[in-house]
Amino acid sequence: MGTKTKKSKDDFTLEAYNGIRRMFFLNEIIPGQKISYGDLAKRLNMSTTPVIQALKRLEIQGLVRHEPNRGYYTENISLSEVIEIYDFRELIEVSLLPDTISGMNKTKLKKLKKALDNHLDAVRDIFLKDRLLKDMEFHMTLAKLSGNRIKVACLKDLFDLLYLKYRGNILFVTPMEMVDAEHIQLYDDIAAGNLERAKHVLTHHIANVKHHAISSIERMQNEKKAKL
């Protein structure tokens, strides 16, 4: 029988980090909430040390904040931050298209087609979180095909903010048919090597998602004010 490898401190920290990220995505941790080290440690079945280390990493990403002598809190929803994230997304994603299209081949196009098909299949499903993940997968696959690792890493951080911090509160509001059509058109333009058309479609697509996200947040904020 083989011996079981003992987990290192880094292994436990990574496990805690991924576990907390999963709680964010599943809405088990909500915006503005005080985070209890002990509660998270119990739910993750580990000590508080790796949990605290994981929270420090999440603080760097902007998902939580630390208040001296009070502990960690999740950040509240910020309209200005959402606008900034989508603006930055547009800058990064559109800037990657020239390299993506110039380096396109049959193998890369097949990868993009698979990501597109996965998304189209997911949006027909009742599981909205799967739809969200497949949407991100399509955009990240497209970005990775450019070969620009630094910009791709920045884009991944932006998706983390959108999909973990804001989750279903604002990201399920764009009509599915609109997203489908825009993704299909974007794929077709990339397959045809039409850079200018692909830039136009991608810019328009991100602007549409941004518009619906802003409208959703403003509606939520107005409803909250009305209850006061």
Language-model regions, residue ranges each:
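Short helix-capping and inter-helix turn/linker motifs at the boundaries of alpha-helical repeat units
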Residues: 11, 110, 176-177
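Juxtamembrane/interface motifs at transmembrane-helix termini
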Residues: 52-53, 103-106, 130-132, 151-152, ...
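Short linear motifs at protein or domain termini
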Residues: 1-102, 214-228
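Mobile beta-alpha loop/short-helix "lid" or hinge segments that flank ligand
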Residues: 60-65, 158-160, 175-177
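Alpha-helix N-cap/N′ positions at the starts of helices
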Residues: 69, 92, 114, 178-181
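Conserved amphipathic alpha-helical segments that form helical-bundle/coiled-coil interaction surfaces
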Residues: 85, 97, 102-168, 181-188, ...
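C-terminal regulatory/effector modules of DNA-binding transcriptional regulators
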Residues: 175-228
